[in-house]
Amino acid sequence: MTDRHELILTCPKGLEGLLLEEATALGLEEGREQTSAVRGYGALEVGYRLCLWSRLANRVLLVISRFPTVDAETLYQGVHAVDWAEHLLPSGSLAVEFSGRGSGIDNTHFGALKVKDAIVDRLRSASGERPSIDKLDPDLRVHLRLDKGQAVLSLDLSGHSLHQRGYRLQQGAAPLKENLAAAILIRAGWPRIAAAGGALTDPMCGVGTFLVEGAMMAADIAPNLKRERWGFSAWLGHVPALWNRLHADAQARAEAGLARPPLWIRGYEADPRLIQPGRNNIERAGLSSWIRIYQGDVGSFEPRPDQNQKGLVICNPPYGERLGDEASLLYLYQNLGERLRQACLGWEAAVFTAAPDLGKRMGIRSHKQYAFWNGALPCKLLLIKVELDQFVTGQRAGSTEPQPQQAPVEQARLSEGGQMFANRLQKNLRQLGKWARREGIECYRLYDADMPEYALAVDLYRDWVHVQEYAPPRSIDPDKAQARLLDALAAIPQALGIAREKVVVKRRERQSGTRQYERQASQGEFLEVSEGGVKLLVNLTDYLDTGLFLDHRPLRLRIQREAAGKRFLNLFCYTATATVHAAKGGARSTTSVDLSRTYLDWARRNLSLNGFSDRQRLEQGDVMAWLEADRGEYDLIFIDPPTFSNSKRMEGVFDVQRDHVALLDLAMARLATGGTLYFSNNFRKFVLDASLMDRYAVEEITASTLDEDFRRNPRIHRAWKLQAR
């Protein structure tokens, strides 16, 4: 075999340029970038060195043949032509990886089988023995890539992917691969900072990947020094003496690096469950004397060991996948920016984010941005110099520079639109707050798309804020809509003086007549609120709605006033808040019907919270079917149906516009002489069927069912009072 080989280094998408620089420094010649790979030439020693020292590659492939292929047979013949006895003992084990399509091979599994058959047949024809297949830990891992009729046949020198350094046996929910973390550190300038004796800190360190990779760079430790099993370990072309020399040299460099005074490397993690796994990973990497991890959140991390120390703050904030994450992530970025301005003046910072728009909310400009991919997710690396002239808030360049401990910390400056939104909230709070205090109301709507460009509903639940974003029409640029949402979320805590963690945000789609809302998350946290002398449970996080329809407050209070001594029926009862009011008002009995077991359980809790249980009947069922079967009489009926509903537990689909006549006829058949039925719904295009007025005394009462907080939006619902003629 020649001692000059074609080598292909694979890597995550976006790392090709960095990998080319690294591989060239390690001896690769004539290197050039390909998609998710670097190709070049070098002696076997270069291949070994790349396996040992590359912080960025996934695999090091040694090309043993290139040949044209037009079909499965020419693929087989091209692989069969290789003298496999030079590479693998007939009694050894083999794994084949196949990528690409073409030449009549559109199935990678079929392609891998043809490659395997060719290797096995060649070895068996020479010795009578055949190798076994071991996909997990083979003696030889063969890779074939098919591209535009050209087959590239390689041996995988690395074995398992090189990002698997061996120290990270425990990890968090969404870890960065080690080679991606190393690439981010290199782009952030950590090798330069480390060479100058700088510090490294990660305020959201998870299980410490950035910290370990950074410490290995600073201590001159080869990333795969501790790997015991390689793709070349049982390869017949392996030269142990050459490998042992390179490994011994790397071992000596690591020992010398660790003998130097350690740099100041610290991590902080808010989740206590990740602290010990992170420490275990650090210990496995042999870096316990270099790295410390502490429990702490972004707002309290202390990156500065002394007033003169400078360094790099690096982090990978969570991406956010649940409903309401926009608010928590916005405030996380704001907290990070505040802490950088407060404690890290003169430092550099690197924020790896899948939401670069949130990066703008930190209040510090980034001077460079790099595109990366985390798997299939496009991300940006924001590089920041924590200097006064980079602050979006606080003092500008030319001002007298304070001492580091006096660095200004201010709330993120609001945009012009954000300030207008904040002013509107404060104006509404002055007006509605006075009314709410006078009426003893704890929960009310503060803002309802008063400014068209900020299409939100903002509700107060005691000292919590519940924000619903109306989905923008297709004519609105989604990026502009997202920017306005972030402006609003930045303004709300400042305008209302409410802690950021008490702001919950959700998105509400415009009603189409075909949508209904499902459970959004599962936190199970309930808040007790009061209304009209009753206590009610709301859940601000788990569902699109909270368990309490604020716009129906006047109707619930009317029911409480009229319920004394009456038999009350609540259809589509939801969490039975109207039932609680009826019971409070002295109803002789109550019956509440809903299809959802979850909401009926919630209703039971609402009733129990107020001491009601004996005479309160909760029925699970399809309301239409239940009414057809029921033979009871009721003096007071309340119906607030959804616009649209379907379920496995009901026959057909309920549509309020189509089905309201049948619904009201069934309900009026159950109304006792002299009784009253209240009907309300929130479908904006709803039209009450005129034929109902021929059969019943019908009075629209919408105006009297709107309190001060909903008079700006008189179409929030419509309501009618029905009685027998």
Swiss-Prot record:
Cysteine pairs bridged by disulfides in the record: none
Q: Which UniProt keywords apply?
A: Cytoplasm, Methyltransferase, RNA-binding, rRNA processing, S-adenosyl-L-methionine, Transferase
Report the Pfam families cross-referenced here.
Methyltrans_SAM, RlmL_1st, THUMP, UPF0020
Q: Please tell me whether the keyword RNA-binding is annotated for this protein.
A: yes
- Name its cellular compartments: Cytoplasm
The record, for SMART domains, names: THUMP
Which family would the database say this protein is a member of?
Belongs to the methyltransferase superfamily. RlmKL family.
What protein name does the entry list? Ribosomal RNA large subunit methyltransferase K/L
Query: What organism is this sequence from?
Result: Stutzerimonas stutzeri (strain A1501) (Pseudomonas stutzeri)
